[in-house]
């Protein structure tokens, strides 16, 4: 049965009743390209949150990093110089919470002069590439909302001095949004209400955009993925890359030491023997406050969404179905009469995959302080 034939889908059917035949023909084509099996996750949304047995995971801490600095740095720089390292910047969001009706990365964070978030991130990257004497390919994930503005911003600022050939943009894949009964919302009479598929969808979106050929052509073996929010982070950090390579692990996560047991940050640990991230609200009081013999927290390192993944492993898990997180959100839509509704309270579900679930699909992961 086609989605528009389902009597339950009242928003789609109401829009079609208002449309002209040619509008419905185009709408049906779009509807047929959407994977509607995602709606099934509403019925089993609680199962995603069922967790296994957590156990602590030893981190590579600052004293060890300092003691092995030359070893880690050499291994990381060798990988960069050999063209084995790429980076992915997750930048699909708008700066709405920052009072900005533009891509978040275009925020001016300068004090005495203009300095944009995107600019600072590329400066951080160029600190690494200048020292290594080799460029790192940068793939920037945008969204339908901000893609054109993001590309135009980079063009306007001449890619902040970074070679244009080493920068590629791709759009994050979108999934439909629905009400609490699974009835798909419409954004307009001819467009389904769609939302980004979560930060765990970045590699799948790269594949869909045809960038796997570029990755193979460049010979990339490691991908450093990170979020746009943190202007201080070191990108393609040779010490981090080197520590991961030397450890023999197929992934690594940059972590920061928790300031307090109840700090609201997810911690890197193991779950049923595999690397995983326990969110702060999933941790029992006993877990949160447990300490080692030296007094340090047993679960003491929080993740900051800066990961290094083996490209080979990413391809191996690309076809695996990642857990779908059903998230209650406020979803603007048109009602059954075609009037725009902007809810003040959550009125339905969006469907997201999370990068933390990619970590759990790895065989091992090194926490790097």
Each language-model region and where it sits:
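N-terminal glycine-rich phosphate-binding loop and ensuing alpha1 helix
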Residues: 3-168, 176, 185-204, 212, ...
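Catalytic core of tubulin tyrosine ligase-like
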Residues: 215, 219-224, 232-236, 241-369
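Active-site-adjacent bridging/hinge elements
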Residues: 88-100, 179, 284-285, 326-333
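Short secondary-structure boundary micro-motifs
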Residues: 71-73, 80, 91-93, 207-208, ...
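Fold-independent oxyanion-binding glycine-rich loops
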Residues: 92, 143-144, 172-173, 208-209, ...
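Conserved beta-loop-beta/alpha segment of the NTase-like Rossmann-fold superfamily
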Residues: 159-160, 164-263
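N-terminal ligand-binding/catalytic initiation module
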Residues: 2-3, 229
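Hydrophobic/aromatic beta-strand patches that form the interior of the parallel beta-sheet core
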Residues: 88, 107, 139, 168-170, ...
């Amino acid at each position: 049965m086609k989605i528009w034939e389902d009597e339950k889908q009242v928003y789609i059917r109401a829009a079609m009743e208002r449309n002209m035949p040619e509008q419905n023909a185009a709408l049906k084509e779009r509807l047929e390209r959407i994977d509607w099996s995602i709606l099934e996750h509403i019925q089993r949304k609680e199962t995603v949150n069922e967790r296994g047995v957590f156990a602590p995971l030893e981190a590579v801490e600052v004293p060890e990093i300092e003691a092995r600095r030359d070893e880690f740095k050499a291994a990381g720089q060798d990988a960069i110089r050999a063209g084995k390292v790429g980076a992915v910047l997750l930048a699909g969001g708008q700066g709405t919470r920052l009072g900005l009706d533009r891509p978040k990365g275009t925020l001016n964070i300068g004090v005495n002069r203009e300095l944009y978030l995107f600019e600072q991130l590329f400066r951080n990257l160029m600190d690494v590439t200048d020292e290594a004497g080799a460029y790192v390919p940068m793939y920037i994930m945008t969204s339908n909302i901000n893609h054109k503005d993001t590309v135009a911003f980079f063009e306007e600022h001449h890619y902040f001095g970074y070679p244009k050939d080493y920068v590629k943009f791709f759009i994050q894949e979108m999934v439909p949004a629905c009400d609490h009964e699974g009835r798909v919302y419409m954004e307009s009479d001819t467009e389904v209400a769609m939302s980004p598929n979560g930060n765990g969808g970045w590699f799948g979106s790269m594949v869909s955009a045809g960038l796997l050929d570029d990755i193979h052509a460049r010979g990339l073996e490691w991908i450093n993925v990170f979020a746009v929010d943190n202007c201080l982070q070191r990108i393609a950090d040779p010490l981090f890359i080197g520590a991961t390579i030397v450890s023999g692990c197929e992934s690594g996560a940059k972590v920061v030491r928790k300031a307090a047991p109840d700090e609201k940050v997810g911690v890197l640990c193991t779950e049923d023997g595999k690397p995983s991230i326990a969110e702060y609200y999933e941790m029992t009081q006993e877990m949160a406050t447990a300490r080692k013999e030296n007094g340090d927290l047993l679960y003491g390192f929080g993740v900051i969404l800066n990961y290094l993944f083996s490209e080979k492993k990413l391809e191996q898990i690309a076809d695996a179905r990642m857990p779908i997180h059903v998230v209650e959100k406020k979803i603007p839509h048109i009602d059954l009469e075609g009037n725009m509704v902007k809810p003040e309270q959550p009125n339905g579900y969006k469907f997201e995959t999370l990068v933390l679930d990619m970590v759990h699909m790895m065989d091992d992961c090194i926490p790097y302080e």
